[in-house]
Amino acid sequence: MNAVVSTITQLLPAEIITTDPEQITLYSQDVFTVGPPICAVVRPRNIDEVQALVRACLERGTPIVTRGGGMSYTSGYIASAPDSVLIDMASMDAIVEVNLEDRYVTVEAGCSWQKLYEHLAPLGVRTAYWGTLSGRYATVGGGLSQNSIFWGSGQSGTAADNVLSVSVVTGKGDLLETGSAAQQRAAPFTRHFGPDLTGVFLGDCGALGIKVRATLPLVPLAGAKGYSSFAFGESGPMLRAMAQISRESLTTECFGFDPYLQHQRMKRASLAADAQQLTGVLQNESGIVNKIKQGAKIALSGRRFMDDVEWAMFTISEGRTEAEADHQAKRIRDICSSEGGKELPDSIPRILAANPFGPVNNMVGAEGERWLPVHGLVPHSRGEAVLAEVEAVYE
């Protein structure tokens, strides 16, 4: 038996440690990369077990990597050397505290974005940034380690922009608190208590410490939502419209499909999936008349309206009132019209908003191809040029 495995087996309960060959193979890779084989997977249930594990690995000189939901493709939890120990945070998924008065929530790092959102929604709040499309599996800790982006990003930015404090187990096994939580008897209500140590542990893929808890700010759920879809003949006008919409903070989510992606997605989607998603839309609407109206609109529009669309843009807006949402929608229409956009049925953003954490099926194409997302963050002024350079690679 590997020396470090022997040590941790004596320190920790056997049921949280596995050296099963199939599990070792699975956990030695992410969605994209197969790394060197690890020697063990450990699923700690509390902070004490994380600390004991780290100290044992430090004593043996064994590297550690930390895994959240396993949805990434950046080699963030791939070992750099064989016989490393992988910490799977899946068992540490508790929602520790919801403080509605001071507007924060503290969760364990293995909590999924979906679990957190569904726990908070009945209370009338959500986190400012509230996860990725893969959020039924992707975790809060993983999102902070990768600095993920999507739900809420149109107004609130990335995951790392929306953290008040983190609890981190250091490479020596000590527990470090950041933000105001670092002060004894103080609540974790603000990030800035002395130097911004919180930021050190965000976007690090777990390399600088093991995040075991995080405290995130809460915002009210929207009183009203608006949805829009537009078709563009070229990418340039669409990107200019998206940039202006973002500069004016008109949406919480604004995203687009290139011609290849949207044709593939329309080909793969099934009528059964459409029916399930329509059910989600109806549950998301208020009032029986509005449920019937929106259900009929989506059913009648189907997917045919996308047949001749080259570049498509979709927005989801949030307002405190219907009047505010309507005002945002009008401004979005004006911006898109000025760039030559043609308005489409709003069924795609409406369905997505009603089913924010759908099946994670974008790793395989409609005909069995292997798909891998490629991401980047650029300023608005560089958007058109960067897309042109990317497209040139494939021409």
Regions found by a protein language model. Give the residues of each.
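N-terminal flexible segment immediately upstream of the FAD-binding catalytic core
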Residues: 1-55, 71-103, 269, 301, ...
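C-terminal substrate-recognition/cap domain of FAD-linked oxidoreductases
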Residues: 21, 239-395
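Flexible loop/turn segments at secondary-structure boundaries
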Residues: 25-26, 72-75, 113-115, 218-220, ...
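Short cationic amphipathic helices and targeting signals
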Residues: 39-44, 105-106, 226-231, 310-320, ...
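FAD-binding subdomain of flavoenzyme oxidoreductases
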Residues: 94-98, 108-109, 113-256
